[in-house]
């Protein structure tokens, strides 16, 4: 992952996290399409904007009914061919062990808004792309399918279990443990005994 001015690039995608400055005239970086950082209809600022090299984009916005007690997010997906999908999702009710990409983005937005786990956006992005040699890309159909992102986060924990990566390892571990907790509370996986 390359990090520059709070703008992150993974080989197939770009995104910005909370409290980052999104360049006003961002058209491409590393041959990436522009992020949808402002909703073209409501003019709301995105919590998590993502752009893929194929021209598709996903962005998460706080819904009109959003409050800290009611963390509803509008997640929008535009594919490179102009197809569009939008869902309203309660970020606190997402089971990351059985979630679509759109649900995972709502979960990441929920984590970001509550300030825990630390660096939630980057952690969620790692769970999305995985630790495989070839990062995972999601077509619109795949973005709507259910995936086990908790297990992918566990892979990130395992691969960084080395003193050289301890800071990242601890961040991934905090996210993994929170994912296990949310999964258990939302009817999914039960917390593993360590």
How would you name each of these model-derived features?
Residues 1-194:
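Type III/flagellar secretion export determinants
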């Amino acid at each position: 992952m390359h990090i520059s001015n709070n703008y992150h690039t993974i080989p197939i995608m770009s995104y910005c996290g909370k409290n980052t400055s999104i360049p006003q005239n961002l058209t491409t970086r590393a041959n990436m399409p522009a992020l949808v950082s402002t909703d073209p209809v409501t003019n709301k600022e995105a919590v998590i904007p993502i752009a893929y090299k194929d021209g598709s984009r996903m962005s998460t916005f706080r819904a009109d009914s959003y409050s800290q007690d009611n963390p509803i997010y509008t997640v929008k997906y535009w594919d490179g061919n102009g197809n569009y999908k939008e869902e309203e999702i309660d970020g606190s009710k997402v089971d990351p062990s059985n979630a679509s990409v759109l649900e995972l983005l709502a979960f990441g937005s929920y984590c970001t808004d509550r300030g825990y786990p630390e660096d939630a956006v980057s952690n969620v992005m790692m769970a999305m792309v995985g630790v495989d040699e070839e990062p995972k890309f999601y077509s619109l159909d795949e973005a709507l399918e259910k995936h086990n992102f908790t297990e992918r986060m566990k892979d990130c924990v395992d691969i960084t279990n080395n003193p050289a990566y301890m800071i990242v390892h601890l961040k991934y571990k905090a996210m993994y443990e929170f994912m296990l907790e949310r999964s258990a509370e939302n009817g999914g996986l039960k917390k593993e005994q360590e």
